[in-house]
Amino acid sequence: MYDGPLQELIDALSRLPGIGPKGAQRIAFHILDAPAEEANELADALREVKEKAKFCKICFNVSSDEVCQYCRDPRRDQSMICVVEESKDVIAVERTRQFRGLYHVLGGAISPLDGKGPADLHIRELCQRLADETVTEVILATNPNLEGEATATYLSRLIAPMGVTVSRLASGLPVGGDLEYADEVTLGRAFEGRLHVGVGA
C-alpha cells in the first residue's frame, strides 16, 4: 500500500475492466514518472469524454453529435440494421468491411444475474425504428455467450411477427482454439453450423 494520491490512483485504475492491481500499479507509476504535460493531457481527455461524448438519438452509438456518422450517411443501406450490445461492437463490425447498413446499440444484454432485463435495453426504440417498414432485415450480432444468446432469442421472437427478416451471425470454434476450452454455447453453434467435407462434399 502506498500513501495518499498514488494509492488513490491505483485504486481508481484497478476498478477499470481488464485492469488488475498489478496493471493499475504499472499505469500509476507510468503517470507518476511522465511529464506533467502528458498527465494533464490524460486528465483533460477523461474530463472531455465525460462532458462532451453523447449517444446518437437514433441508434445509441457513441457520437460527438446528436446523430452519429453512420445514421447520417446516405450511402449506408437503410434496409438493414445490425443489432449489437455496445458501441465497441460497432467498431468491430466496421473493421470487417462486410456490412454497409445501419446499427442499433442495445446498451448491454439481458442478464437476470446482473438485474438487467429487456426494459433496461434500447429494445423499444429498435421496434420503433422497424415500424416504418423501411428496414427489411435485422442482423442480431449480440455476443455468443449465454446473455447474448438470451437477448438474440428474445429479439427474434419479438421482431419476427413484424414481417422483418431476422438473421443471427454465425459463430463457432475460433481458429487455433482447443475443443476442451470451448463453452457449451460455442460448441453447440459449431455443430449446428458444421460443413460437410471429404468425397462428395
Swiss-Prot record:
Chain ranges of zinc fingers (C4-type): 56-71
TM helices/strands, residue ranges: none
SUPFAM superfamilies: Recombination protein RecR
Coiled-coil stretches noted in the UniProt entry, renumbered to this chain: none
GO biological process, one term: DNA repair
Pfam annotation, one family: RecR_HhH
Record has Zinc as a keyword: yes
Alphabetic keyword roster: DNA damage, DNA recombination, DNA repair, Metal-binding, Zinc, Zinc-finger
CDD domains the UniProt entry points to: TOPRIM_recR
Keyword DNA damage set for record: yes
A GO molecular function held by the record: zinc ion binding
Start and end residues of each Toprim domain: 79-174
Listed PANTHER family: RECOMBINATION PROTEIN RECR (PTHR30446:SF0)
Function: May play a role in DNA repair. It seems to be involved in an RecBC-independent recombinational process of DNA repair. It may act with RecF and RecO.
Family indicated by similarity: Belongs to the RecR family.
UniProt protein name: Recombination protein RecR
Originating species: Cutibacterium acnes (strain DSM 16379 / KPA171202) (Propionibacterium acnes)
Lineage of origin: Bacteria, Bacillati, Actinomycetota, Actinomycetes, Propionibacteriales
